[in-house]
Regions:
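C-terminal output helix
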Residues: 86-87, 107-119
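Acidic catalytic/metal-coordinating carboxylates
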Residues: 33-34, 60-66
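Acidic, metal-coordinating helix/loop segments flanking the phosphotransfer/catalytic sites
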Residues: 31-49
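Alpha4 helix (beta4-alpha4-beta5 surface) of REC/receiver domains from two-component response regulators
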Residues: 63, 83-104
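Active-site residues of response regulator receiver
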Residues: 9, 53
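Receiver (REC) domain active-site loop signature in two-component systems and cognate sites
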Residues: 56
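Two-component/phosphorelay signaling modules centered on CheY-like receiver
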Residues: 12-30
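Conserved phosphotransfer cores of two-component systems
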Residues: 43-45, 68-74, 97
């Protein structure tokens, strides 16, 4: 099965790191810095995994997760945030109540090994 990652993070340096790790793990990667572009890419990419930053301009991660839930998303979701780690846990609970599969939360800055381990789930 081909693994496809759809990644949205407005901080390019973090998304570049995740993209490099994912490609080394043989993921096909679709990447954007804007939530609206994430929404446009969702059907085309057909992700098996999603990395979703919680705090972005234009739309936050909670709004994107609600959008994903409305579409019946079955991808494994990894929530990342540069803010309080509790924010990621709150987002994980909210996502689960909407039927989404959040497999992990990551706080920025994160280690390469943590990303590698989580993408291997």
């Amino acid at each position: 099965m081909n693994r496809r990652l759809l990644l949205v993070d407005d901080e390019v340096e973090f998304s570049d790191i995740i993209e490099r790790i994912a490609k080394k793990l043989d993921f096909e990667v679709c990447k954007t810095t804007h939530p609206s572009e994430f929404q446009r890419q969702y059907d085309t990419c057909n992700p098996t995994h999603i990395v979703l930053d919680m705090i972005m301009p234009e739309m936050d991660g909670i709004e994107l997760m609600e959008w994903l839930a409305q579409r019946g998303c079955t991808a494994k979701i990894i929530v990342i945030s540069g803010y309080n780690a509790q924010y990621g846990n709150t987002a994980k609970s909210a996502a689960a109540s909407n039927g989404l599969n959040v497999v992990a939360t990551l706080s920025k800055p994160f280690s390469v090994s943590a990303v590698r381990s989580i993408l291997s789930l």
